[in-house]
């Protein structure tokens, strides 16, 4: 049993995570965010990303990145994306960061995140828009910064790796 303390903008939480109940090793994100989450959220709110946290704050689908960080923090399936979004810490944080990005006025995604992180943002929003309901913050983020367009590489990778009968439509 592992114990992690987290600090959110609203309250201090203590969550006990049992490794056996974490088939996707989502704890890797919780651990990575332990020191950087508040800073990442602050940078997004200010409309200027300055430090390095993109991989574990806005994760992408597996197969998009080539660095060790992108591989470590890649989401490998639709089921893992759903588990991430349902996680009591990670889902809330992802939504909070996406809401913060949507709330930034007068800047493009490339002005806030710079290349290539603006592309990673579109990939992340695409991934989680697929596993969320219409009108989600992920769809709103895509609408605001990417003319509603999903990242084609993410859609393609999700389509070719999705098991037969998956309940989410990737297209």
What do the predicted segments below correspond to?
Residues 33-45:
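A long, hydrophobic alpha-helical segment
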Residues 20, 124, 128-134, 142-144:
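N-terminal targeting/disorder module
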Residues 43-78:
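Hydrophobic/aromatic-rich, well-ordered segments within soluble, folded domains that form packed cores
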Residues 83-132:
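Mid-chain, well-packed structural core segment of small domains
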Residues 2-35, 163-166:
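Extreme N-terminal tail/first-helix region
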Residues 72-93, 145, 152:
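C-terminal end-helix/capping segment
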Residues 133-171:
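Charged phosphate-binding loop/patch that engages nucleotide di/tri-phosphates or the phosphate backbone
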Residues 63-69, 129-139:
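Short helix-capping/linker segments at secondary-structure and domain boundaries
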């Amino acid at each position: 049993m592992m114990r992690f303390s987290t600090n959110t903008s609203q309250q201090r939480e203590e969550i006990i995570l049992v490794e056996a109940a974490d088939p996707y090793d989502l704890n890797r994100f919780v651990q990575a965010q332990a020191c950087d989450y508040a800073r990442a959220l602050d940078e997004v709110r200010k409309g200027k990303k300055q430090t390095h946290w993109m991989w574990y704050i806005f994760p992408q689908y597996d197969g998009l990145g080539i660095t060790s960080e992108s591989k470590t923090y890649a989401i490998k399936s639709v089921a893992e994306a759903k588990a991430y979004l349902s996680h009591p810490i990670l889902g809330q944080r992802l939504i909070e960061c996406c809401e913060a990005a949507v709330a930034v006025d007068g800047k493009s995604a490339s002005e806030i995140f710079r290349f290539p992180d603006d592309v990673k943002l579109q990939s992340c929003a695409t991934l989680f828009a697929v596993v969320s309901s219409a009108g989600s913050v992920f769809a709103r983020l895509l609408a605001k910064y990417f003319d509603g367009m999903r990242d084609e590489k993410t859609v393609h990778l999700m389509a070719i790796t999705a098991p037969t009968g998956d309940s989410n439509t990737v297209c």
